[in-house]
UniProtKB/Swiss-Prot annotation:
<dbReference type="InterPro" id="IPR017438">
    <property type="entry name" value="ATP-NAD_kinase_N"/>
</dbReference>
<keyword id="KW-0547">Nucleotide-binding</keyword>
<feature type="binding site">
    <location>
        <begin position="173"/>
        <end position="178"/>
    </location>
    <ligand>
        <name>NAD(+)</name>
    </ligand>
</feature>
<feature type="binding site">
    <location>
        <position position="160"/>
    </location>
    <ligand>
        <name>NAD(+)</name>
    </ligand>
</feature>
<feature type="binding site">
    <location>
        <position position="162"/>
    </location>
    <ligand>
        <name>NAD(+)</name>
    </ligand>
</feature>
<feature type="binding site">
    <location>
        <position position="143"/>
    </location>
    <ligand>
        <name>NAD(+)</name>
    </ligand>
</feature>
<dbReference type="GO" id="GO:0003951">
    <property type="term" value="F:NAD+ kinase activity"/>
</dbReference>
<feature type="binding site">
    <location>
        <position position="197"/>
    </location>
    <ligand>
        <name>NAD(+)</name>
    </ligand>
</feature>
<keyword id="KW-0520">NAD</keyword>
<feature type="active site" description="Proton acceptor">
    <location>
        <position position="64"/>
    </location>
</feature>
<keyword id="KW-0963">Cytoplasm</keyword>
<dbReference type="GO" id="GO:0006741">
    <property type="term" value="P:NADP biosynthetic process"/>
</dbReference>
<keyword id="KW-0418">Kinase</keyword>
<dbReference type="InterPro" id="IPR016064">
    <property type="entry name" value="NAD/diacylglycerol_kinase_sf"/>
</dbReference>
<comment type="function">
    <text>Involved in the regulation of the intracellular balance of NAD and NADP, and is a key enzyme in the biosynthesis of NADP. Catalyzes specifically the phosphorylation on 2'-hydroxyl of the adenosine moiety of NAD to yield NADP.</text>
</comment>
<comment type="similarity">
    <text>Belongs to the NAD kinase family.</text>
</comment>
<keyword id="KW-0521">NADP</keyword>
């Protein structure tokens, strides 16, 4: 297999692990390349995750942010597996002490766990896809925004809140959960609408069919920000419109045998 290794470089341990895993995988006959930031740290020829990039597998060493950042860098589908070098690591299925064992066991065709993403248009312009969520928040603290929410052209609600999360099942264990949204099995395809600190007690989260088109209109005159997967942000103003649909291109994760509820139990310590 051709395997690309991506790693956070702000900590010594992930970089050292990237080096040792690369040696191990090469000894097993794999073609190993390194994404440009970690390649620079290790003195290897860099590879850019651009439209010309190709690999059978991307191994990400880091936390959930590293995985989200890697997937947003790709403009086509490549299977990803994460090795947890962060904190919770809900998107990183492999713990450090199991990395060599699990990577050694992988072979083509890889067992895949596709995850639904949402595509986002802002004022008629595509701003990409989100694996976890798109969030509209006030650009100034303690200011309330007003949103009109439409599903398939029908207005279903109007929120006054600090913000609004439009999330995926994968994102249901991230920001949406901390805002009071439900935990949704990642094998279900749906969209979540979760208001942030709503003014009205009657404002509640929605779970919407993934085949629906969701339109969010910012009625408020106050400035706001659109943040996608915690990575990219855009300034939005009065009468801004967002269209959210199910993306035709899911994110592809390697299935290493850890079920969704096993991860919920371990990562969130519910039991």
């Amino acid at each position: 297999m051709k395997i690309c290794i991506v790693s956070r470089i702000d900590l010594k341990e992930p970089v050292e692990l990237a080096q040792s895993l690369g040696w191990m995988l090469r000894d097993q006959g794999h073609d190993v390349v390194y994404e440009q930031s970690v390649a620079a740290e290790l003195g290897y020829a860099p590879v850019s995750l651009s439209k010309d990039f190709s690999a059978d597998l991307i191994v990400v060493l880091g936390g959930d942010g590293s995985v989200l950042r890697t997937i947003r860098m790709l403009d086509h589908q490549v299977p990803v597996v994460g090795i947890n070098q962060g904190q919770v690591g809900f998107l990183t299925d492999i713990e450090r002490d199991k990395a060599e064992e699990i990577l050694t066991s992988l072979s083509l065709p890889l067992p895949l766990d596709p995850r639904m993403r949402i595509s986002i248009e802002f004022n008629g312009r595509s701003v990409g896809s989100a694996l976890n969520e798109a969030v509209i928040v006030t650009s100034r603290p303690a200011k309330i925004l007003k949103f009109a929410v439409f599903v398939n052209g029908r207005q279903i609600d109007e929120f006054r809140a600090d913000g609004l999360i439009i999330g995926t099942p994968t994102g249901s264990t991230a920001y949406a959960m901390s805002a009071g949204g439900p935990i949704v099995d990642s094998t279900i395809e749906a969209m979540l609408l979760v208001p942030l600190a709503p003014y009205m007690l009657s404002s509640r989260p929605y779970l919407i069919n993934s085949n629906s088109e969701v339109e969010i209109r910012l009625v408020s005159v106050k400035p706001a920000l659109l943040v996608i997967d915690g990575q990219d942000q855009y300034e939005i103003g009065e009468n801004a419109t967002l269209l959210i649909r199910k993306s035709p291109d899911p994110a592809l994760f390697v299935d290493v045998g850890r079920g969704f509820f096993d991860k919920v139990e371990q990562k969130l310590r519910l039991l």
